[in-house]
Amino acid sequence: MFYAALIALTSVLDLALKSGVESQPDTSYPKEVKGTGGIVQVRKLHNEGFPMGIMKEKPELVRCLPLAVASSLLLRLSCLLPKKGNHLEKAGLACMIGGACSNLFDRFFRGYVVDYLYIDKKPVSRVIFNLGDVFIAAGTLLAGLSGLLRAVAGRKKR
């Protein structure tokens, strides 16, 4: 139940932020995030492709490939849920699925993903992203760390 709630929370949080960004006129952006000295900004970008607009001329692929990946992540989580342990991997998968669901909602219902976070520091200053992307990245790190820890634990048993 915890992992289902994590999926819902991550997805709904990002969708709520996207809705707030969408409700404001384009002319109200960019906005500085207070306390960051202008380094973190809220912007408004409609991304019809993969990150950085890649493949925007292939909308079917841009919708279907992330759907296939999210489905495989959901299948993996479904296989892990009945098993004890693997909490780090389960949490990572839930974060990835939640972020993916938010972006998939955008792709299928808006026709584009709403990106709104900008950090004016290299190397990330080339990208505008959203909280769903952050959850996907964090989930990837958690799942990867889980695999690394299992590998280290397996070597110690030898």
Which residues does each predicted region cover?
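Alpha-helical transmembrane bundles and membrane-interface segments of multipass inner-membrane proteins
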Residues: 1-158
